[in-house]
Curated annotation (Swiss-Prot):
It comes from the Bacteria. HAMAP family: UPF0335 (MF_00797). This is UPF0335 protein BH15140. One of its GO terms (molecular function) is DNA binding. InterPro entries: GapR-like, GapR-like_DNA-bd. Signal peptide: none annotated. Belongs to the UPF0335 family. NCBIfam families: PRK13694.1.
Length: 85
């Protein structure tokens, strides 16, 4: 019975190690991708584009059209309320 427990423990440890190693590999890939994105933004800025505006466009493109429209309407409402229009 003790052998079964030891084998189960060994399997659990191996599985845990595999999960951790996968996460570590993915974190490294994420860092590499993040560095690549920073390089693209640097190129973008070097070409005369406004990186802040491009980030806003990218954020908006991730949203559904109805979400964008709702956000724009709320922003316009707030701007009107503050006399900014």
């Amino acid at each position: 019975m003790n052998t079964v427990t030891d084998e189960t423990h060994a399997i659990s440890v191996n599985q845990l190690r595999a999960f951790i190693e996968r996460i570590e590999r993915l974190e490294e890939e994420k860092k590499t991708i993040s560095d690549d994105i920073k390089e693209v933004y640097a190129e973008l800025k070097g070409s005369g584009f406004d990186s802040k505006a491009v980030r806003s466009i990218i954020r908006l493109r991730k949203k559904e059209e109805h979400e964008r429209m709702e956000e724009e309407a709320i922003i316009q409402l707030y701007k009107d309320a503050l006399g900014m229009s």
